[in-house]
Amino acid sequence: MSGLLSRRSVVIAAAAVVLAVAVGGTAYALSASSSAHVASLPLAGRSQAALKVTSGTPVLDVSIANLHGDLMRVSTPDGASVRPVLSGSAPIVLSLAGGGTTSAQSTDYTVTVVLSSSVVWSLDFAAGTQRTEADLRGGRVSGIAVTAGSDILDISLPRPSGTLPFLLEGGVSQFLISLPGGVPARVTVGGGAAYVSTGSQDLTGVAGGTVLTPPGWATATSRFDIDATSGFSRLTVTRWNPAASY
């Protein structure tokens, strides 16, 4: 019996080593009950981090929360055809790998990303989606780039410290962006647009190269700089109440 227990111990130890080095040498603290469809990284004292999403997905859902000792957590449904993989460190790269061979696995799924509110984030959405939803209120963001196409891009941003650049290089049908009230946003429509609503202006047939600069933007110490180099159909800017708790 003792020999059998020893062999089991060796197998368990070997499995732990495989988990630790399976992706780019990055160790994952997964409990015995953890699903293969969940990946996380430890906070490890970091105050800032960059994330690049490199695999396309039907729906990408990103939010901010107090994760205590975790830097980020990513999940796909247990029945999804893919599972999340995290690699690298600067930036951290989120990709998707095959989730198994079960014929009933779904190809209509959401990749859910929860980011720690304890760090300042730089985000690059570099893979196409049908819909990207990112509610980043309650967090801190230094910059965002969307470099791949999306049917619907729906993003809520926190109050920035200084200038927060937002680069839109991937084509988008509907671009919905919610900003804190009282923070000016300059919008550069580099590729043209069918419709733009900034809250103070409603424009149709907007020519490429149009720059919409609100009063006070040039001297503001907290502001957004939205540069849409690619074309889009509709841009709607709304405002949320910064006095609300998120």
Describe each PLM feature range.
Residues 1-8:
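Terminal targeting segments of Actinobacterial cell-envelope proteins
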Residues 22-42:
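C-terminal region of N-terminal signal peptides and the immediate post-cleavage residues
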